[in-house]
UniProtKB/Swiss-Prot annotation:
BP term (GO), one: tRNA methylation
Origin species: Shewanella sp. (strain MR-7)
Compartments where found: Cytoplasm
Name used for this protein in its record: Dual-specificity RNA methyltransferase RlmN
Keywords: 4Fe-4S, Cytoplasm, Disulfide bond, Iron, Iron-sulfur, Metal-binding, Methyltransferase, rRNA processing, S-adenosyl-L-methionine, Transferase, tRNA processing
InterPro entries: Aldolase_TIM, Methyltransferase_A, RlmN_N, RNA_MTrfase_RlmN, rRNA_lsu_MTrfase_RlmN/Cfr, rSAM
Phylogenetic lineage: Bacteria, Pseudomonadati, Pseudomonadota, Gammaproteobacteria, Alteromonadales
Amino acid sequence: MSEKKINLLDLDRKAMRALFADLGEKPFRADQLMKWIYHFGVSDFEEMTNINKVLRQKLAARCEIVAPEISSYQKSTDGTIKFAIHVGEGQEVETVYIPEDDRATLCVSSQVGCALECTFCSTAQQGFNRNLTVSEIVGQIWRVSHFLGFAKDTGERPITNVVMMGMGEPLLNLANVIPAMDIMLDDFGFSLSKRRVTLSTSGVVPALDKLGDALDVALAVSIHAPNDELRDILVPVNKKYPLQEFLAGIRRYIAKSNANRGRVTVEYVMLDHINDSTEQAHELAQLMKDTPCKVNLIPFNPYPGSPYGRSSNSRIDRFSKVLMEYGLTVIVRKTRGDDIDAACGQLAGDIRDRTKRLAKKRMQENQISVTMN
């Protein structure tokens, strides 16, 4: 039985150099290889013309460069493109490309499904199967870059920003997310600025501390409620890591960080008559008074079976004005790609749920139906 080949997309520069040392090669050869992969999109060793033939043969014998395939894609009327990425066993994750005048952002997934159970998120309703590997995370960027055209072909960088805001909780897959983000930031990788790579978390505090020790990227935090009582319902991980504990972890992270310029982005989904009153706006402003931040208000994007509705523009406007009275910077996120279910909270993919969450939910619904009848 032949030995399984090493997928080079799984290796950050440190691991790549270790592999080359094992091959008896100097570190700069690893850097050359990374440039071929991430700057030029090359996956065939024979095309790497500044690497000698003997080394190319060694690499071909032991290694491969394999990214997950794009199964399908949909393009929104606003230019947003949602990609279904096949990750094996009939499963797909979703990745979203969001073009703007001054940037091109890719929203990347970190898990097949999500282990958290936020009640307003479509991904959470699908259950959870597994963590994505490093190659499956960076492979999303690599594949979409191929789809759009690498800079060598177009003269322009196809993706300028990456946000870890797709399917999954990135901090629950830290072992793979950290090397994946290392590759995003590496000059020999995708060469993105640390201010242009953003990780979004619902608040797994111990992992946030580990991230702060390992990497400096922009941080976005999913708050969504001004108090623990409501957040326990909307974001159940709050029962384990309540708001004050989460906020303390956020302050520790931004104290170490240059990428965040001294403040964090607070994400707050606007749910009609759930978390959008002026009283709750005052409460949120008070909650955040010791944590430097800007607030991103996200109009809720409904999905089939969702128990919530989107806040009206007038309620969002009133909420925003209250926050600004406290001196907070407030941005109301423009909804992108909702016509193809690519907007915030709408990503679902195709998942084999190992948590049996959907089955349990249907059983509970059936029991309620029987009781009512």
